[in-house]
Structures are given as C-alpha cells and as structure tokens.
Amino acid sequence: MQCIKCIEINLLQKKLGYFFHTVDLLLRALTHRSFSNKHNERLEFLGDSILNYSITNILYHRYNHMDEGDMSRIRSSLVCSRTLVELAKEFKLGNCLKLGQGELKNKGYNRESILADTVEAIIGGIFLDSNIKTIEMLIAFWYQFRLNKIDLEDKQKDPKTRLQEYLQHHHLPLPIYCINQVQGQAHDQIFIMNCQVSSLKYSVMGRGSSRRKAEQDAAENALKFLIEINND
C-alpha cells in the first residue's frame, strides 16, 4: 500500500509556506484519481478558479498602468500549465503524489498534467482550510519572482501571438494550423501539429502534450525560420 511519510508532508508544507489545520485536505489534494475515488479533481476545479481570480486581482492592483489586453495576456502566462509545473517542481510535489500502480509504472509523478493539476488542487485545499486572503497572499509569495520579471514587451507574448503579429507587420496571410498526428495512449498523448505559412515552402511542425501546446511549439518554430530567412 502506498503511503506518504510525515516528513515528506512537513517538507512540502514548509515549501508551500503554509501548514494545514486539516491535513486531510492536503492529502486529498495530492490524491490522483488512479489511486482512489476520493481524488483531487473537485479541489482542482476550485483551485483553478481561485488562481485565476488571485492573479487577476494582483495584476489589477499592482500594475495600474496595465490595460485589459496586457492583463489577460500576462495572466495567461502565469496560470498556464508550464508555470504550474515549474511551481510543482519547486515544491518537489512528485515526491508526495498518491498515485495508482499503473501511474507509478508510467512515472506519473513526472507527468506535467498531473503536476499542474495537483498545484491547483492544493490551492483549492488551502482556500478551504483558511480563506481567500490567505491563499491570495500565498499565491503572491509563490509568484513573487515571476511578478517582478513581468515585461509588457513582446517576449511575454505567446508564440502564436508573436507569429501573427509578425505576419501582419509583413502584410502576409495568417498561419493555418492542422493536426498531423496524435501519438501515444489516451492518458499520455503527444500531438504533432503543422503550421502552414504562405512564405515558407514547407509546413513547420510542433509537438506537445496538448493540441494548444503543439500549436505554440509549431508557431515558435515557424517564427524562427521566418526571422532567419528574412534576417530580421
């Protein structure tokens, strides 16, 4: 039977900067559906909404010069799976996950989707264990370095946005994205997307664990080719 040692729970709570009054909430947040029907998906749903609200509130009050478009774009970069996975690794969440045998064999403790979902579940758990003010302060603490690095220039924009703006600037048609291939089993798929740009002879491919990530990767690759060809 899989168990989580008290020392691991204490280390995790130290990294979070929060000690649960009801530790069962933390244990539930760490429980994947493959381990038990008392899993973390409801907490994840709650945490997702709280994270979006908290980041929005922080941006609104911290950057009063920021317009709606910039806030939306930067919020997206702060709450995306990639950033949540970074947080999960900082917390060393993989050491504490409660996974079924199948997920353990497939190294589920390294799967980005599981790590990102667990961070959201922990946020939901802390909210239920305390209040909105406490979790918002914690989120601000976790994101402090990232918030300090916020730059409203192009490097904060996602690759698809940057590619679109590049093409518009050069008076070229917008790109077309289409699925090339889907590899792997349903629980661990890799999407391969084509990005078609009129000024490139061939479609440019991108890979990712979701269609959106694959499109972003393809856009990034297409933009690199265009910049290299045009010496921009």
Swiss-Prot record:
GO terms for molecular function: double-stranded RNA binding; metal ion binding; ribonuclease III activity; rRNA binding. GO terms for biological process: mRNA processing; regulation of gene expression; rRNA processing; tRNA processing. It catalyses: Endonucleolytic cleavage to 5'-phosphomonoester. Its cofactor is Mg(2+). It comes from Blochmanniella floridana. Mg(2+) binds at residues 44, 117, 120. Residues 9-131 form the RNase III domain. It is found in: Cytoplasm. Belongs to the ribonuclease III family. Pfam families: dsrm, Ribonucleas_3_3. Its EC number is 3.1.26.3. Residues 158-228 form the DRBM domain. The keyword RNA-binding applies. Keywords: Cytoplasm, Endonuclease, Hydrolase, Magnesium, Metal-binding, mRNA processing, Nuclease, RNA-binding, rRNA processing, rRNA-binding, tRNA processing. Its main location: cytoplasm. The active site is at residues 48, 120. It is an enzyme of class 3 (hydrolase). The gene is rnc. This is Ribonuclease 3. Homodimer. One of its GO terms (cellular component) is cytoplasm. InterPro entries: dsRBD_dom, RNase_III, RNase_III_dom, RNase_III_sf. Digests double-stranded RNA. Involved in the processing of primary rRNA transcript to yield the immediate precursors to the large and small rRNAs (23S and 16S). Processes some mRNAs, and tRNAs when they are encoded in the rRNA operon. Processes pre-crRNA and tracrRNA of type II CRISPR loci if present in the organism. The keyword Cell membrane does not apply. Coiled coil: none annotated.
